[in-house]
Amino acid sequence: MYSNKGAYALLLGSGISRSAHIPSGWEVEEKLIQKIEVSQGVAESEDWHQWYKDCYKQSASYSALLGEIVKTPTERVQLMRFFFEPTNKEKELGWKAPTKAHLAIARLAKEGYVRVILTTNFDRLLEKAFEFEGITPQVISYERAISQATPIIH
């Protein structure tokens, strides 16, 4: 890494944010399934995902779950905010804030060791860590934005 700065990319999943008390994708799905179950009068289930699969004849997906619970993009943002944005109490506890790992990655980027970071995360902890380092990252969060992105020069 030291002899070939910038030649590496990172791929991050939800594990990087778990210690910040951000739920994993699986856990978010479980909570969304629970919301659907409660609305249908089901109070408890040993396996939330299996209940959904049995009831809907398909595996749970974010799109399907959100389509069941909310109808507008604004409602979607409000629903998902609970999972990723800290409440006042969570702020006091230091939860849902960039971790040492997020900050270390931001420093690696600032120093030029890493130029490309791919993440499957919905949270913005990595972007916040970049802001702490004075970096404005180019974030591509949906497919159409790829064609509008600034090309990476090697």
Describe each model-derived feature in a short phrase:
Residues 1-154:
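Conserved catalytic-core helix/loop/strand module for nucleotide-ribose chemistry
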